Amino acid sequence: MVFKEEKRGNMTNRKVALVTAAAGAGIGAAISRQLAEDGFAVVITDAHERRCGELAAELGKKYGREFLSLPLDVTDFDAVGIVVEEVLKQYGRLDVLVNNAGWNKLEPVAEMSPETWQHCLDVDLNGTFNCIRHVLPEMIKRTSGPEVPSAVIINISSIAAWETSTEHGAAYSAAKAGILALTRVAAAENGKHGIRINAVSPGLIYNDFLRRIYPDEFFEGYAENRSLVGRVGQPQDVADMVSYLVSDKAGYITGEVFTVSGGVSPHA
């Protein structure tokens, strides 16, 4: 049966979730698919417009309802604002933000170009801030108080935020560590508004991008020698954690960091 989404004016009867970097082959797409399965009206945003449309079409065909897809460069503060305005225009609400956009280039500190350093911080950390900054005022308007959380923000960080023994990843580690600090402060400021903000820090997650870079032996060695559960993580592992954290079952959880690494690097 084709589901027709009920609307009253410009309000949808479904909770609305905006996911950044949502249309690739990795974590973002897995999160988008899971939230769609959970019943959310998922807004698919990505720098790659074609892939946005393809994922929206895939989900629309599967669930019999339309999914909004919008191109987005999270480093552009004004562009983020335009996307948020469009979401509110289409749905009249925004309940969940998942900040998943990230970028990395491995260079040793002694040789790292200022461009590499800045671009990594722009995408990973500043992009997360840009989205939070535009979304929070709208979430606060709809607050129902701390007893009934009105909205949720999930920031995707990495175990690289504290596992700094990884060589050539200073920019990425710095950006991801910054996300954790931003998460905690934003959570402290906005709990009174009924807004929960948490971070998820994945370990090695198998995806098509990494598969093109590393041989199979790399993943096999990681699973055998580092993972406590004997395997490499999958995008769905992260999506499952996000699914729980945005649900009402996680209503008492905010300002926390959740590690999804197979026990490789538990966060102290």
Give the ranges of each region predicted by the language model.
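Residue(s) in the substrate-gating loop at a strand-loop-helix junction
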Residues: 158
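Short C-terminal tail/terminal secondary-structure segment
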Residues: 2-4, 26, 243, 254-268
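Canonical Rossmann dinucleotide-binding motif of NAD(H)/NADP(H)-dependent dehydrogenases/reductases
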Residues: 12-43
